[in-house]
Amino acid sequence: MNETKHSFVLSSASPRRIELLNNIKIFPKIIYSSDINEDINSKENPKKYCARVAKNKALKALEKYPEEFILSADTIVFCSNKIFLKPKDKEEAKDFLNFFSGRKHNVLTCVCLAKNNLIKVKKVVTKVTFKRLNKQEIEEYLSTNEWKDKAGAYAIQGYAEKFIKRINGSYSNVVGLPLFETYNLLNSQGLI
């Protein structure tokens, strides 16, 4: 199949984001991983944190590709202003899952499109409700290692899907890139 490359740089190494874009026949011209500081500033709420990280990923990529449009994104999980990033280890992943057990939480993705002085950021929140998890379910899930490199320690598109009682909002947002908003952002600049 002949894939038409679209005129933008995707500032993300996430295989999930690449796959989501490819699913709707969007193929970035360049894929670049921006290495930036993603530490949480104690004064930032989840939306400010996520927007800052997405924007900084785009700005870092603009340093390398100053003539290109840059698409970047950051996904976090939050509940009551507590931010859950990617767990550092299995123990932290277990803590996250215990916290989400039987509760609602939010998945937030900030998508940024940048070039020169143009910086547009879209924020998309999806509410996710987990069923109550027992110890065995958590241990079983942790043994899959699916929790690695996932905000909030789970992947809705994988084994953890059976834990999710309901979602309210964008499914693709929970995977890592809200496709409706991303498509419209790219389309607004004539990139697709």
PLM region spans:
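Anionic-ligand binding patches
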Residues: N2-F8, E44-I192
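Cofactor-binding loop segments of dinucleotide-utilizing enzymes, especially the Rossmann-like FAD-
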Residues: A13, S34, N116
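N-terminal beta1-alpha1 ligand-phosphate binding loop
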Residues: E3-I26
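A short beta-strand-loop structural module common to alpha/beta enzyme folds
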Residues: P28-D39
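Surface-exposed, flexible loop/turn segments at secondary-structure boundaries
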Residues: R16, N37, I119
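Short loop/helix-cap segments at secondary-structure boundaries that form the rim of catalytic
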Residues: L20-N23, N41, E63-K64
